[in-house]
């Protein structure tokens, strides 16, 4: 019984540490974004160009073959 209680307490402490570290890291990231501003983070929008939402005829043919 003592071992189970110890494991439960250790687990609760670890979960609490994880949730607090997530909040701290979020605030640090928010501060970094505020320091850099929108001009510094404009390069991150270039990742949107990697995804092409259009489906080509070859893609449709391949999907039909699979079905």
Swiss-Prot record:
Region forming the signal peptide: 1-23
Residue(s) carrying Leucine amide: 36
Propeptide: 40-67
Localisation per UniProt entry: Secreted; Target cell membrane
GO CC annotation terms, alphabetical: extracellular region; membrane; other organism cell membrane
Cysteine pairings via disulfide bonds: none
Effect of residue 34 to N: In spiniferin-M; increase in antibacterial and hemolytic activity
Keyword annotations: Amidation, Antimicrobial, Cleavage on pair of basic residues, Membrane, Secreted, Signal, Target cell membrane, Target membrane
Tissue: Expressed by the venom gland.
Protein purpose: Alpha-helical and amphipathic peptide with weak antimicrobial activities against both Gram-positive (MIC=41 uM to >82 uM) and Gram-negative (MIC>82 uM) bacteria. It has extremely weak hemolytic activity against human erythrocytes.
Entry domain remark: Amphipathic and cationic peptide with an alpha-helical structure.
Family: Belongs to the non-disulfide-bridged peptide (NDBP) superfamily. Short antimicrobial peptide (group 4) family.
Protein name: Spiniferin
Annotated source species: Heterometrus spinifer
